[in-house]
Amino acid sequence: MKITARPDSRLRGESVFYRQALSVCLFLAASVSLAVGRDLALVSNKANAVSTITFPDLVKVSKGQTNRWPDGKSVTLIMRSPSTPEMKLFLERVYEVPESQVKEIIASANHGRMGHPAVMIVDSDEELVNKVASIPGAIGVVDVYAINSSVAVVKLAGKLPLEPGYLLHGN
């Protein structure tokens, strides 16, 4: 007895493969768009007197051009690595230069500030929130959903995250 495959079985196998490949592609596309479209927030150490900051002042802090808050505390910006997709929005809006130049700006801002850098880079939102909570004068840029009670949310240009017109809104 000779067994032969049905002519459409190969096509059915290819169809399953293409459906699975399409599913993977859609998942990856959604993941990338979520990473790029995240809403960011500014948070500060609770002992920090800063509850609101203008956009030009945020740019100065980000570039290490502001050394002290009005209350005299040293300024430290804590952020995720400029190479992470989560920071794309921040780089575009605040630094307005390519990632490689942002790294140069950060290195220049930190030059001569041993022990108290102008800008600190961390690996995760959780680490960022913990650093901001533990360093007086610290301010951080974090995914809005990583905020917890250990830090204070800072208004940017008079707006809180998720309010219409907020400058670090991801979409």
Residue ranges and their predicted role:
Residues 20-31:
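Bacterial N-terminal signal peptides
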Residues 1-18:
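N-terminal secretory signal peptides that target proteins for export/translocation
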Residues 15, 31-32:
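Hydrophobic alpha-helical membrane context
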Residues 5-7, 30, 57:
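Exposed boundary/loop context
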Residues 6-8, 21, 162-165:
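Generic low-complexity segments that are intrinsically disordered, proline-rich and/or Lys/Arg-biased
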Residues 11, 29-30, 134:
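Residue-level detector of alpha-helix boundary/anchor positions
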Residues 35-171:
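Exported/periplasmic ABC-transporter solute-binding proteins
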